[in-house]
């Protein structure tokens, strides 16, 4: 069980998150939608302390961390239960694909390098990049780089995978391969919290869709509830703006 309680975050005088509460069940795929600047990515980044919330509590299984009073060890334990997929891939340019995936196993999990590289190759095979292990990021397409980024997060076998707009930096021709991999993970019952503008993905894959506006969760429900029977005027306006009527 994953639980966010009363999460607040301010940047200067601007309150970006206004007391978010969210429970996530094991194996659940939750997609967060909403206009830019509504706090979606900030919420995602507070889950594993890439951004430290000003107030609130985050619980993943047996680890519960107060965002105001905590130790480095508690934060590290929380992070070890999550994997983060960045919008801009965030691969190490001086490492090949295999090394990028293996790095976390060595530095976070304490694996021997040879074992980590072997596991990394297995993951590359699994994500359809088995022949790209020796390739450096500059030699990979955007879609391939993002799949390596997902593979790196998968390698740690996290309780929760966090996706921050994983397709928004991609050329259109590479979006499909990344979404296909995410669907594969969903079918394997990987718990996922996804911020995306890919409405079709939300419709097809999410167990629950959350609409955020002005730092709050305004409406949430099944894809059918959100897309076919929206209640809040702000959600109706947003769906109209993105071409869903």
Residue ranges and their predicted role:
Residues 155-159:
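A short, proline-enriched helix->beta-strand linker immediately N-terminal to the Walker B motif
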Residues 161-164:
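Catalytic Walker B motif of ABC-type/P-loop ATPase nucleotide-binding domains
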């Amino acid at each position: 069980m994953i639980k966010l309680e009363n999460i607040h975050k301010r940047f200067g005088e601007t309150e970006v998150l206004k007391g978010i509460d969210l429970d996530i069940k094991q194996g659940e795929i939750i997609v967060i939608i909403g206009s830019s600047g509504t706090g979606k990515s900030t919420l995602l980044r507070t889950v594993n302390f890439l951004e430290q919330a000003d107030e609130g509590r985050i619980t993943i299984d047996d680890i519960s961390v107060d965002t105001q009073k905590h130790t480095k060890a508690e934060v590290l334990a929380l992070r070890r239960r999550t994997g983060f997929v960045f919008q801009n891939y965030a691969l190490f340019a001086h490492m090949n694909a295999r090394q990028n995936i293996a790095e976390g196993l060595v530095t976070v999990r304490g694996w021997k390098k040879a074992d980590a590289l072997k596991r990394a190759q297995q993951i590359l095979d699994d994500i359809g990049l088995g022949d790209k292990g020796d390739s450096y990021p500059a030699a990979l397409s955007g879609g391939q780089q993002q799949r390596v980024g997902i593979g790196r997060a998968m390698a740690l076998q996290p309780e929760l995978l966090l996706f921050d707009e994983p397709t928004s930096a991609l050329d259109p021709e590479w979006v499909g391969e990344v979404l296909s991999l995410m669907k594969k993970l969903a079918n394997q019952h990987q718990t996922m919290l996804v911020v995306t503008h890919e409405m079709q993905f939300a419709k097809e894959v999410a167990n629950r869709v959350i609409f955020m506006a002005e730092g709050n969760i305004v409406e949430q429900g099944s894809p059918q509830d959100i897309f076919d029977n929206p209640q809040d005027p702000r959600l109706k306006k947003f769906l109209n703006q993105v071409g869903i009527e």
